[in-house]
């Protein structure tokens, strides 16, 4: 766990402390994209029926 270089976060990506940050940003962006996709997909039939 602890080495001469510092604390390893264990992602094995070679990104150091930025690994979890980038993973979190990618996760949040993916969740927002899926949320937007499902929200728009479910809204289309209702909009088509209203016309």
Curated annotation (Swiss-Prot):
GO terms for cellular component: magnetosome membrane. The keyword Transmembrane applies. The lineage of its organism: Bacteria, Pseudomonadati, Pseudomonadota, Alphaproteobacteria, Rhodospirillales. The chain crosses the membrane at residues 9-29. Belongs to the magnetosome MamD/Mms5 family. This bacteria makes up to 60 cubo-octahedral magnetosomes of about 45 nm in diameter which contain membrane-bound crystals of magnetite (Fe(3)O(4)). Residues 30-51 are cytoplasmic. Keywords: Biomineralization, Magnetosome, Membrane, Transmembrane, Transmembrane helix. Residues 1-8 are lumenal. It is found in: Magnetosome membrane. This is Magnetosome protein Mms5. It comes from Magnetospirillum gryphiswaldense (strain DSM 6361 / JCM 21280 / NBRC 15271 / MSR-1). Residues 9-16 are annotated as: LG region. May undergo N-terminal cleavage. Might be involved in magnetite crystal growth. It is a single-pass membrane protein. It comes from the Bacteria.
């Amino acid at each position: 766990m602890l080495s001469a270089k510092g604390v390893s976060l264990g992602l094995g990506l070679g990104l150091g402390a930025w690994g979890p940050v980038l993973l979190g940003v990618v996760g949040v962006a993916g969740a927002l994209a899926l949320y937007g996709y499902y929200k728009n997909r479910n809204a289309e039939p209702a909009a088509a029926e209203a016309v």
